[in-house]
């Protein structure tokens, strides 16, 4: 696994005239090496691949990063990096500009002299966009866990509970069934708070005759799922039923037509144009979707301005919504993988308008 990814990374490095890359991002480190420890760095040259870590992980690291030379780094990791580069006669080092703070860059530049630091962006992230078969298996399991969590919470949630109580039950259920944790701060937004696209769970007490939006996911074996469903407890305002049906129509239309070769803006328009047709375009203020993988928000983007080209193996969300301040909102989201001819849906929770008893 790791070796194949390193070979692809080297191809990308050669295209950018990069002889050595210093990987500081924890996500990219795990993607390349498989190492899950909390501290470490990856150094990749055109001939060698090193995992640099400290004493605490010198047993774990060789077990996980089997295709890497594991090195216990000096108190200052830059001393070890400098030594390894000198032995390979390399005097330029690329670093991840999107991960390294200015303070860290300043320290690296001083400590690594006379090695020249070169900022690069997206070398590893571009590899992560296309998922291989093993990654897709893990992501399907993460999606399955999100589905089972939603099914569980339908039998748990009741009026009189706080949103936070529901959030904690969802977190406990996902962890009990194999998740490391939730893949992001769970959104449980009830009543008028459902008009907040990112209304994370609060101490609000769930009442009757209102909507609840659940937006959540599981982080499982390093990969995220991301599922949104909106339900009712008791009969809500008829206007909310109306916008539910519009959002569902938009989402189903997008799922039916998203395919490889399409741009992110074209995919976005599939859902957005339907919502606009019904007069709610101004109440759908976020993108239709985003890439999903080791992070919950990755490329490609399904938005009004996105020129990203959808390709087989990409995993994206499809999540249109309508939000009416003071009344409530609806969002419906699934995870899909782009296939050779269209897409396959990974999440399968019911999208029928569900009304639970008060």
Where are these regions (language model features)?
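Active-site neighborhoods and metal-handling regions in enzymes and metal-associated proteins
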Residues: 1-358
